[in-house]
From Swiss-Prot:
Subcellular location(s) of the protein: Mitochondrion inner membrane
Catalysis performed (reactions): a ubiquinone + NADH + 5 H(+)(in) = a ubiquinol + NAD(+) + 4 H(+)(out)
Protein name per Swiss-Prot or TrEMBL: NADH-ubiquinone oxidoreductase chain 4L
Topology in membrane: Multi-pass membrane protein
InterPro entries with a match to the protein in the record: NADH_UbQ_OxRdtase_chain4L/K (IPR001133), NUOK/Mnh_C1-like (IPR039428)
Source organism of this protein record: Pipistrellus abramus (Japanese pipistrelle)
Oligomer and partners: Core subunit of respiratory chain NADH dehydrogenase (Complex I) which is composed of 45 different subunits.
UniProt keyword terms in alphabetical order: Electron transport, Membrane, Mitochondrion, Mitochondrion inner membrane, NAD, Respiratory chain, Translocase, Transmembrane, Transmembrane helix, Transport, Ubiquinone
EC number: 7.1.1.2
Main subcellular location: mitochondrion
Molecular functions (GO terms): NADH dehydrogenase (ubiquinone) activity
Length: 98
């Protein structure tokens, strides 16, 4: 395992642990999700470059498109919750409350 793979996997693991630990605020959850997507993008890109796989060359671009859509939806949800409740706690997103 090369040092690059180790660093990317460490970034992925730290982002995932951050997503599990800091679930109280929506902004910190969104930042951890962006870290996950960025490390996954780097890992997929490096893997495709090393294996010279031309069939999967569009996969990093598709991953970036999904990451951008996820970021836009997350930020719009953050703005909507902040305008409605005045704070960005994840507990305000419970759909079972009336």
């Amino acid at each position: 395992m090369s040092l690059t793979y180790f660093n990317v996997m460490l970034a992925f693991t730290m982002s995932f642990l951050g997503l599990l630990m800091y679930r109280s605020h929506l902004m910190s959850s969104l930042l951890c999700l962006e870290g996950l997507m960025l490390s996954l993008f780097v890992l997929v890109t490096i893997t495709i470059l090393i294996t010279h796989s031309t069939l999967n060359s569009m996969l990093p671009i598709i991953l970036l498109v999904f990451a951008a859509c996820e970021a836009a939806l997350g930020l719009s949800l953050l703005v909507a919750v902040s305008n409605t409740y005045g704070l960005d706690h994840v507990q305000n997103l419970n759909l079972l409350k009336c």
